[in-house]
Amino acid sequence: MELGGKCNAITTTTMISTEVKPHTDPEPEAKPESDPSMALFPIKKENQKPKTRVDQGAKYRECQKNHAASTGGHVVDGCCEFMAGGEEGTLGALKCAACNCHRSFHRKEVYGHRNSKQDHQLMITPAFYSSNSSYKPRVMHPTGEIGRRTSSSSEDMKKILSHRNQNVDGKSLMMMMMRKKKRVRTKINEEQKEKMKEFAERLGWRMQKKDEEEIDKFCRMVNLRRQVFKVWMHNNKQAMKRNNSNISE
């Protein structure tokens, strides 16, 4: 009996010692879940400033706006460089304080980023086409050639701008300007010529200060202006003298 009890005790002890506890790994630390929208729209840092056009070293040179495009001509205002009309970031900064044109009309020049294709690029000025006009657009280089090729005076520019809203083409506008510059000629009949000839011979073909009253009276009688008589006498002085000398011979 004692032997059997010892065996049972040994068996029980062996079973307890052979039990192996399962090995458990420590639980991993929970990582915060990342929002997929954060990858698509990254948040900019406060001290990170976006690069503007001014930071890139861009300058806007002469104004290339054509003020006579509607009439088929080409007139620029002569503004040589863009000057902002307000502080950076405002709407006034996009308008030139000198010519009041938008910044996009000025030639852009970026230092260190000059495009080699720009030298060969051609710019066609906008033209006004009509059925009666055979005007063809001019081809120009955008590298400061406008100021040399278009030497328009301020008076011509004002005349062209005054006809911008009217339905006239370039040919009609040029005819109008030529008509204004043409001198009006006074028509003189034969009777007036004979009277002027007699009076000029009496004066000796010279207008002297002592004869001013008599000259004014004569001009009122023949219904001609004093300047007309003066010009006629100057133009016919030599011819009349030659005729008189030929007759005497």
UniProtKB/Swiss-Prot annotation:
A GO cellular component entry from the record: nucleus
Swiss-Prot/TrEMBL keywords: DNA-binding, Homeobox, Metal-binding, Nucleus, Transcription, Transcription regulation, Zinc, Zinc-finger
Site entry (Required for DNA-binding), positions: 233
Region annotation (Disordered) ranges: 11-54, 134-156
GO MF entries: DNA binding; protein homodimerization activity; zinc ion binding
Zn-finger (ZF-HD dimerization-type) residues: 60-109
Tissues where the protein occurs: Mostly expressed in flowers and inflorescence.
Residue range(s) of DNA binding per entry: 181-244
Xref: PROSITE patterns: HOMEOBOX_2 (PS50071), ZF_HD_DIMER (PS51523)
Function per UniProt: Putative transcription factor.
Comment on protein domains: The homeodomain differs form the typical one by having namely 4 instead of 3 extra amino acids inserted in the loop between helix 1 and helix 2.
Name of the molecule in the record: Zinc-finger homeodomain protein 7
